[in-house]
C-alpha cells in the first residue's frame, strides 16, 4: 500500500485483525502498543485488569493539543460532540474479538475518506495521526471503554514530570523514578532526535532483567 496514505500509526489500527488472521494467531485479548513504549520486566499482567472491555487510559497530558485536535476533526465527523473527559491515548490499548466489528468499520471509514483524512492530518489539524479519529469513532459507536488502568501503567511525558530523576538523598540507589515506580514507560513528548538515544540508555540499564525462562521439560 501507499505509505503516504497508510502510515504506520494508521496501519496498526486498520490491519490488526487482518494480520492476526494472516498469521493464524489465536488470542484471547490483544494489546496494541506504539514503539515508543517499554514495559517493565516484572510488571503485573495488565490483561487481568481489563474485564474483557476495550481498555485504554484517559489522556490529559497535553490538553491544548487534544482540544485543538478534537476541534480540527469535528466538521469531518458531522459536528459530533466528543466528550474530552473520555479521550484516550491510542498508544496502548487492549481489546478482544468482540471489538473486531469496531475496527472493521474504522477501516472502512478510513478507506472511504482517506484523501480527506490525510489532508486534514497534514495541512489543517497537524495534530497526530489516528488517535483523534479513533476517539471520535469509539464515541460515535458507543464503545464501552475501561479507563481504570492504574497510573503506573501510563507513564507519559516523563521528562515533564521529572520521572527521569532519582532520589538524590540516597546515593546508593540512583534508579530513575520511572523505572522504580512505573510499569509501562512511554517516551513521548521528547524531541524526536533524542528519543531513540534515551530509549537505548534505558534499555542498557534494564536489559539484563528481561530473562526468558526456559520451558518446562516434558
Task: Please place each PLM-identified region on the residue numbering.
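Glycosyltransferase catalytic domains, chiefly GT-A lineage
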Residues: 1-218
Amino acid at each position: 500500500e501507499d505509505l503516504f496514505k497508510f502510515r504506520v500509526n494508521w496501519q496498526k489500527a486498520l490491519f490488526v485483525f487482518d494480520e492476526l488472521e494472516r498469521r493464524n494467531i489465536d488470542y484471547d485479548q490483544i494489546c496494541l502498543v506504539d514503539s515508543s513504549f517499554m514495559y517493565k520486566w516484572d510488571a503485573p499482567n495488565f490483561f487481568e485488569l481489563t474485564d474483557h472491555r476495550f481498555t485504554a487510559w484517559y489522556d490529559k497530558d497535553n490538553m491544548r493539543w487534544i482540544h485543538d485536535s478534537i476541534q480540527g476533526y469535528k466538521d469531518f465527523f458531522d459536528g459530533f460532540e466528543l466528550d474530552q473527559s473520555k479521550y484516550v491515548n491510542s498508544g496502548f490499548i487492549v481489546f478482544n474479538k468482540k471489538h473486531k466489528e469496531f475496527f472493521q468499520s474504522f477501516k472502512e471509514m478510513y478507506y472511504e475518506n482517506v484523501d480527506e483524512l490525510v489532508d486534514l492530518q497534514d495541512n489543517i489539524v497537524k495534530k497526530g495521526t489516528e488517535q483523534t479519529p479513533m476517539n471520535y469513532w469509539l464515541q460515535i459507536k458507543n464503545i464501552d471503554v475501561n479507563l481504570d488502568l492504574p497510573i503506573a501503567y501510563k507513564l507519559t511525558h516523563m521528562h515533564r514530570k521529572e520521572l527521569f530523576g532519582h532520589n538524590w538523598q540516597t546515593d546508593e540507589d540512583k534508579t530513575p523514578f520511572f523505572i522504580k515506580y512505573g510499569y509501562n514507560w512511554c517516551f513521548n513528548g521528547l524531541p524526536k532526535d533524542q528519543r531513540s538515544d534515551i530509549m537505548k540508555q534505558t534499555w542498557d540499564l534494564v536489559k539484563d532483567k528481561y530473562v526468558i525462562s526456559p520451558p518446562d521439560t516434558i
